[in-house]
Design a protein with these regions (language model features):
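Helix-loop-helix junctions within the multi-pass membrane cores of secondary transporters/permeases
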Residues: 22-53, 57, 81-82, 102-111, ...
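Structural signature of hydrophobic alpha-helical transmembrane segments
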Residues: 68-80, 123-132, 208-220, 404-414, ...
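Helix-loop-helix hairpins and the membrane-proximal interhelical loops
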Residues: 16-74, 245, 249-344
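Short, small-residue-biased leader/transition segments that mark boundaries at the very start
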Residues: 1-5, 473-480
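Flexible hinge motifs at transmembrane-helix junctions and intramembrane kinks/re-entrant loops
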Residues: 213-214, 227-282, 314-318, 446-459, ...
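Hydrophobic mid-bilayer segments of alpha-helices in multi-pass membrane transport proteins
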Residues: 103-105, 130-135, 172, 219-227, ...
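Alpha-helical transmembrane segments of multipass membrane proteins
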Residues: 83-91, 112, 138, 227-231, ...
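Inter-helical loop and helix-membrane interface segments of multi-pass membrane transporters/permeases
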Residues: 62-70, 112-124, 146-169, 178-230, ...
């Protein structure tokens, strides 16, 4: 009888190991000391933090907002661009990073279509520029440019990364963390505009702001969510970020921050009739494949502008992705001994390919989202996190009003918490050496106040090399 029990126990252990090995066969979940449950929670956290892009992206690209007949098409293109890009991250790069049309870049595309560049570019023209920028980014990621110290071939893009000073690379995660937190504070109306000082803390003493749905109510929703996340994280509760977002969403209902009209289909451009959105998208008249059909018929005399815009799109996408990947991967400890993210080349190929796919579908540059840090902070370490995000974006196309119902103030609590977690990387910066501390500080502060990861990196590198050349020149002995 004892032998029978032993065989049953051993058999159970064997089956358990077999089952675990199957679940790990592709994503290597146990290798990174994670679990399927953790990865699912992480994917949900990332999605909830970035779901706002579904409505914000069409509004940024189309100046007419929901009144523009192309709004539904751009919404579908936004979701599909996010799905394709994030699936590439899941299956090619196998990293817990999510992609979607990037903020800032979509506003640039909107200004191009709106005529702000001095030429009247069509929607197809703008998508063609984005498409070519994606091709340039892809070429930079695959063209070989020498070998590293291990004899492995490296790409031109990797050479650019290797040429980045260490002080700047160490500053990127800190800057991105503060940048994410700053976005969260703004989305929550905790930080508001001021015509004299540009920014200020929301005035909690102003009774007008306490009206139902007012700025103080939004701030309270985010602060409440942050407190919930912090307390649950202190006790190592899995899914603390998601619970915090959902709890603050519930609080937002009586405070009037959440718009209940969204759920009943009373908001223009947001409907439960998903087939109407798909019909508009697949008609082909609004966005899809316009980059090919009408994209390369540029206005006369706009060649130089087109070249500059294309290079700008490619460089912003590349440096934004580099910065986001370094920040998120360093926070998740998914970096090699040289401080580079694991599967770095595949991450870049995934990003550039997603940009090309997005342009063909009719949306602006698809890039790796800093909100991926929300999933990383929830424990996401593998491509399964990205897969969950992609699935949720797929579902969102059919349940758009439900996801649009989550107020930005509720998601802001997660962004602020991510900023707290990424701030710990500041201890890696050598502040004893001014040659490192000054460029590091400029990188961080310019990234936040300049509202651009790329500008922060660029300013930091510029200051570093100016100081480097100046100090070398000053330290040279005078020859007689």
């Amino acid at each position: 009888l004892g032998d029978v029990y032993k065989r049953q126990i051993l058999g159970g252990v064997f089956l358990k190991k077999t089952k675990r090995s199957k679940s790990d066969s592709f994503f290597n979940i146990s290798k990174y000391k994670s679990s399927v449950k953790t990865e699912i929670f992480a994917g949900l956290a990332t999605f909830l933090a970035m779901a706002y892009i579904l409505t914000v992206n069409p509004n940024n690209i189309l100046w007419g907002g929901t009144s523009d007949p192309r709004f539904a098409s751009v919404f579908i293109a936004t979701a599909l661009g996010a799905i394709i890009g994030t699936l590439l991250m899941a299956f090619l790069a196998k990293m817990p990073l999510a992609q979607a049309p990037g903020m800032g870049l979509n506003a640039m595309v909107g200004s191009i279509i709106g005529g702000a560049m001095g030429f009247t570019f069509s929607y197809g023209n703008a998508m063609a520029l984005v498409l070519v920028s994606g091709i340039i980014f892809l070429l930079l990621s695959i063209i070989p440019c020498g070998k590293d110290k291990y004899g492995k071939k490296v790409s031109l893009r990797e050479k650019i990364f290797d040429g980045m000073p260490k002080a700047i690379r160490l500053s990127i995660p800190v800057g991105i963390g503060l940048f994410i937190a700053f976005i969260g504070l703004q989305n929550a109306s905790i930080i508001v505009d001021n015509k004299f000082t540009l920014l200020q803390l929301v005035d909690f003493n102003n009774p007008e702001f306490w009206a139902k749905g007012g700025t103080c109510c939004s701030a309270i929703v985010a602060i409440f969510g942050l407190i919930v996340i912090t307390i649950l994280s202190h006790y190592n509760v899995k899914g603390s970020v998601i619970i915090g977002i959902l709890a603050s969403t519930v609080l937002s209902i009586p405070l009037g921050v959440a718009n209940l009209d969204i759920l009943v289909g009373k908001v223009d451009g947001i409907s439960w009739k998903f087939w109407e959105n798909f019909q508009a998208f697949f008609s082909g008249d609004n966005t899809v494949f316009l980059s090919f059909v009408k994209g390369f018929d540029f206005p006369e005399g706009s060649l130089l502008t087109c070249i500059m815009l294309t290079i700008t799109f490619a460089m912003i996408d590349m440096f934004d992705t580099m910065g986001t990947c370094v920040g998120c991967c360093q926070n998740a400890k998914l970096i090699d001994e040289d401080g580079k993210p694991l599967n770095y080349d595949k991450i870049m190929i995934s990003d550039s390919t997603a940009t090309m796919a997005g342009a063909m579908l009719g949306t602006s540059t698809v890039t790796t989202f800093v909100e991926s840090g929300a999933g990383v902070s929830a424990g996401g370490k593998t491509g399964l996190t990205a897969l969950v995000v992609a699935i949720l974006f797929l579902v969102s196309m059919f349940l758009f009003p439900l996801f649009a119902f989550i107020p930005s103030a509720a998601a802001a609590s997660a962004l602020i918490y991510v900023g707290v977690l990424m701030m710990k990387n500041v201890v890696n910066i050598d502040f004893e050496n001014v040659k490192n501390s000054v460029p590091s500080f400029i990188t961080i502060i310019a990234m936040v106040l300049g509202y651009s990861i790329t500008d922060g990196i660029g300013m930091g590198i510029l200051i570093f090399f100016i100081l480097d050349l100046s100090l070398i020149h000053i330290s040279e002995p005078t020859r007689h």
